[in-house]
């Protein structure tokens, strides 16, 4: 799934760490109403980011995360960027820089992280459009600083709903069986194709009965 990809967890984890007030509220159980499984997902993202940032070679990214976190905690004036702007800044560092530098003529397997990061920026951009987020501001918005209210809405509502609904990873519709990947197909999709190994499921199942008894009685009368 999209949200289980390593590059997505790392990107979201770094983004979360850039908002220490959200992290503090999360750790103090202010968001206790969140689904436990989703809470664990948030924790996994934070742990993934912390583990990566612990590497001495990630000093530049670690400095960026810390600088942004301090700035957002003590925000006095509106920023000249939004959440998507933060993502673009984040992508200037490794490993995102290398991922986004992958040649577009490589296979689907190698391009998947690139496509997933592109989809993440689209999702964040759509959130900003729907919520009219033009800046991150310390001004009051519904009883909280706008930067805090919007970060909560982004992580606790928007991403939660997307995570709960499920988002598929990038797939190339023109390539049913890319090298190094396992294809999941319907019987209709697989017609006329040959594979060295085929696994089928539910062979003993039968189609669901969806007949309308009232309609059947009318037709038979």
Task: Give each language-model segment a name.
Residues 52-189, 193-194, 205-218:
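Accessory C-terminal helicase-associated subdomains
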